[in-house]
């Protein structure tokens, strides 16, 4: 793997990232921005701190926690990714085995986005509301992520343990029958 910053030369490179996924800090609302040394980024590099001071920033304890997550051991990252792949594969395989659903393998998130084939409800939003009402399984309607690509889908998180995912998927399967 070669980072874009190494091959960019003097072309501008701006990296935006957060701590939610890799550092398990979902909901802490902290991220960072990094620049390469391109002279074209001078005005941005100079003025961004001014903008950051105007906006409400993440509280100080969270900033220190984020710093420690970078300084501390990183071995958990590969273990976490490996476990997430197992959960992802479990969820995708189960979803694809349920009549009326089809799901591609996600490659960069901890969500699956199955397509609802022959939806008996008028919309994907109605589908997820009925799923919640009848089973207690909470998902998010796909059209909430944009009508063009999201309609007819729903989003399910595969962060919970396999036992919890299995329970939820059993409920989804019963709901789809």
Predicted regions located by residue number:
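Helix N-cap motif at beta-to-alpha junctions
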Residues: 118-121, 161-163
């Amino acid at each position: 793997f070669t980072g874009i910053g190494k091959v960019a030369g003097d072309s501008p490179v701006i990296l935006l990232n957060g701590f939610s996924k890799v550092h398990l800090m979902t909901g802490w609302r902290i991220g960072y921005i990094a620049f390469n040394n391109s002279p074209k980024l001078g005005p941005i590099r100079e003025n961004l701190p001014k903008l950051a001071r105007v906006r409400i920033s993440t509280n100080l304890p969270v900033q220190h926690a984020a710093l420690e997550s970078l300084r501390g051991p990183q071995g958990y990252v590969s273990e976490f990714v490996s476990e997430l792949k197992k959960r992802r594969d479990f969820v995708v395989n189960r979803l694809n085995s349920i009549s009326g659903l089809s799901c591609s393998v996600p490659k960069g998130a901890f969500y699956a986005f199955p397509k609802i084939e022959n939806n008996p409800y008028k919309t994907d939003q109605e589908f997820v509301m009925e799923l919640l009402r009848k089973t207690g399984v909470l998902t998010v309607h796909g059209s909430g992520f944009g009508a063009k690509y999201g309609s007819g889908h729903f989003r399910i998180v595969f962060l919970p343990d396999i036992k919890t995912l299995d329970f939820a998927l059993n409920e989804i399967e019963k709901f789809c029958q």
